[in-house]
């Protein structure tokens, strides 16, 4: 009696979906949870609770030290690319001058041969000698020519004869960009933001009993005293840096035209919406699926240690 098909499901000429999952081959998708989502009070670069937070006009929050190091690294990379681009332009100019010199020398040589030669280049005597000297496709001259052609042939399927592609360096952008949103960003466009910490009695007893760290801090809206969480939409004032919940900012700021904490004048353009933190729920977050393409064979052994989800 033949065995069931489920016991012989690995002898097909192609990979099935189950075999791809077990081997980790192809496009792998993973559902991200709450632990993989950045909270609202974390730096977008170091992913740790921010220290001296700075914000751009798109709402991305960074540590002051992290964003300064990022700008410094971008400046160094721009200088390196500019140097490489200028070196390439100089090399192209030298090659163009050399090509023009060779072309001019070739034209002068042809002009000299046409005007000062005693006999034409292709005479009947030379033509007859060349004709008599040819002994067919098996001659030594033809064989050596074919061997030389094979050696210099641009066969892309041979590693030794693969033509090298010229690497061109494009002119780089001279401005720094936001590491999170990739838009143009300068240091003067950043502004410091100030969160209001929760100084209630429970928080005070908690900080006295345990070592105080930035992980234990919780922040509140200075207007409604509601604890700020990842589910709330936050608004920062670029004029003074204070952070409010979106409800208070839309309710009081357009009417009073001043900050509710320091009474500093503010306008509608000073309201900057901060990027919300992640909760891990599909209704709140947009991108909760990680995707990666892997080139793995059956002999890698990773299929044995990779967890298979059902």
Swiss-Prot record:
Pfam family, any one: zf-NOSIP
Keywords assigned by UniProt, alphabetized: Coiled coil, Metal-binding, Nucleus, Repeat, Transferase, Ubl conjugation pathway, Zinc, Zinc-finger
EC supergroup of this enzyme: transferase
Documented EC number(s): 2.3.2.27
Catalytic activity field: S-ubiquitinyl-[E2 ubiquitin-conjugating enzyme]-L-cysteine + [acceptor protein]-L-lysine = [E2 ubiquitin-conjugating enzyme]-L-cysteine + N(6)-ubiquitinyl-[acceptor protein]-L-lysine
UniProt entry tagged with the keyword Ribonucleoprotein: no
Top-level division of the source organism's lineage: Eukaryota
Location of the protein in the cell: Nucleus; Nucleus speckle
Recorded GO MF terms: ubiquitin protein ligase activity; zinc ion binding
Disordered: annotated span: 110-138
Chain intervals with Basic and acidic residues compositional bias: 122-133
CC terms in the record's Gene Ontology section: nuclear speck
RING-type zinc finger span: 43-67, 221-263
Primary residence: nucleus
Biological role: RING-finger E3 ubiquitin-protein ligase that plays an major role in maintaining COP1 homeostasis in darkness. Negatively regulates COP1 protein accumulation by targeting COP1 for ubiquitination and subsequent proteasomal degradation in dark-grown seedlings. Negatively regulates the accumulation of SPA1 protein in the dark.
Name used for this protein in its record: E3 ubiquitin-protein ligase CSU1
Originating organism: Arabidopsis thaliana (Mouse-ear cress)
